[in-house]
């Protein structure tokens, strides 16, 4: 395949295509999904780590930074492509030096490894894993040693390690279900809002958002159109202000 014959050119071509609609904006920050699907039941081979290093080199040459998310399953219709906890732990260990070596081009690490798209939606993780164990490994192996910040789907997950402040203080949020600061019933979609079941998450982020980078994206665009759940501009501004967003994608999946 072309990507294996000349990975550097393949990566550069893909970045060019991906960034073409935004070329006049001189993009310096992007969100990247790195799928390890082919290795979900075995170690990462040397060649995979080498290709990832080439990718980081290309970013460095282009003076870009990324929000980096490792994942296995790229569809909630293919949950069987997820990885088990033992292999997740092994891959995190294998990626430790790579992440540390390239921390200068990583804005944040995001969620990752668990669930469809690495989003940490619990209903989409197969086989089941211990979320606390995975979170601790990510923070202990990838985030803290590299001096990076980490972003999780919900403050609820952040609270898993609220008894260890050095790690807790490195965690922000990547909201995969942004609807603005509104009170409509049933709009959570496994996110959190100002008056929903996870109201405490909303209030917690309002208190803590100033101290870590926050990121978000609109909910699935097709779904928004079908359900007529269109985000109000003023409500969007209010949420971004109160939760102090550092970055945001107006198109779900960062397209």
Sequence positions of predicted segments:
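Non-catalytic accessory regions flanking glycosidase/transglycosidase catalytic cores in CAZymes
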Residues: 1-27, 94, 100-101
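Lectin-type carbohydrate-recognition ectodomains
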Residues: 6, 88-93, 149, 153
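Extended hydrophobic/Leu-rich segments
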Residues: 7, 11-15, 31, 35-36, ...
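Aromatic-lined substrate-binding rim segments of carbohydrate-active enzymes
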Residues: 16-21, 28-73, 148
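Short, flexible loop/turn elements at secondary-structure junctions
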Residues: 34-36, 70-74, 99, 113-115, ...
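The substrate-binding groove and active-site-proximal loops of carbohydrate-active enzymes
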Residues: 35-47, 76-86, 115, 119-128
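An active-site-proximal structural segment forming one wall of the substrate-binding cleft
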Residues: 47-65, 82-108, 130-142
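Catalytic-core regions of glycoside hydrolase
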Residues: 105-255
């Amino acid at each position: 395949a072309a990507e294996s014959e000349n990975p550097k050119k393949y990566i550069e071509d893909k970045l060019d295509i991906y960034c073409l609609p935004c070329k006049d904006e001189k993009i310096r920050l992007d969100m990247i999904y790195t799928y390890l699907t082919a290795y979900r039941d075995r170690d990462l081979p040397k060649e995979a780590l080498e290709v990832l290093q080439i990718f980081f080199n290309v970013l460095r040459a282009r003076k870009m930074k990324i929000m980096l998310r490792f994942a296995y399953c790229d569809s909630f219709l293919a949950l069987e492509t997820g990885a088990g906890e033992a292999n997740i732990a092994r891959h995190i260990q294998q990626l430790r030096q790579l992440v540390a070596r390239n921390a200068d081009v990583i804005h944040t690490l995001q969620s990752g490894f668990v669930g469809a798209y690495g989003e940490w939606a619990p209903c989409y993780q197969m086989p089941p894993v211990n979320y606390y164990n995975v979170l601790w490994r990510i923070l202990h192996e990838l985030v803290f040693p590299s001096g990076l910040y980490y972003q999780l789907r919900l403050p609820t997950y952040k609270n898993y390690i609220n008894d260890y402040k050095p790690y807790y203080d490195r965690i922000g949020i990547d909201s995969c279900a942004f609807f603005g600061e509104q009170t409509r019933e049933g709009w959570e979609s496994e996110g959190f809002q100002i008056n929903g079941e996870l109201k405490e998450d909303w209030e917690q982020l309002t208190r803590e958002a100033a101290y870590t980078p926050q990121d978000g994206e609109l909910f699935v665009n097709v779904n928004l159109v079908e359900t007529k759940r269109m985000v109000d501009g003023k409500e969007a501004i209010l949420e971004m202000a109160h939760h102090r967003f550092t970055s945001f994608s107006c198109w779900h999946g960062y397209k």
